[in-house]
Amino acid sequence: RVLKARLSDSHFIWKTDTSITIKNLNKKLKNVLFYQGLGSLYEKTIRLSKVSKCFSSLFNVDETLAKEASLLSKFDLVSEMVAEFPELQGIMGSYFTKLDGKSKEVSIAISEHYKPKGISDEMPTTNLGAMLSMIDNIDTLTGFFIINKKPTGSKDPFALRRAGFSIVQILMKFKLNISISDLFTESFNSYKNS
């Protein structure tokens, strides 16, 4: 009985979410704060799209797909499904973009960009997913360092160490030869220009 009610709720939420266009969900990100002093989640996606131009060739991905994946990477966070089931972030974005006719590459990248979640977690399998994951983590690290919210020996409330480990894991797995300072310079410039 409980399972049936839960499934019925999920079906209703799915119908509600899929009745709203991705474009309108994405606009809602303008009203969702990433963090005080770091702008909205919408602004974060704009920064990601700017930085993606610099790194798409490094990852050997199409610049247009990189920009699209960056701009759509967070819209599912304002969906009812992710509000109800937060562990589905990225996964729902992938489903919604497939349903909307977006490319398979973009859908997979949206799902993969939260990987890896830890040192022993699954890695992105696609170049586009890896690039999006890396620039998202770089944006987060850069932003929190700009506002002086650095991790300490005993505290890391924003999981910045995990973000740093994720960047290193991606660089190693995809055998990317790039200066870490170049990565952060591009990200810093995207904050400066937003």
Q: Which residues does each predicted region cover?
A:
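Amphipathic alpha-helical "coupling" segments that flank catalytic cores
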Residues: 1-194
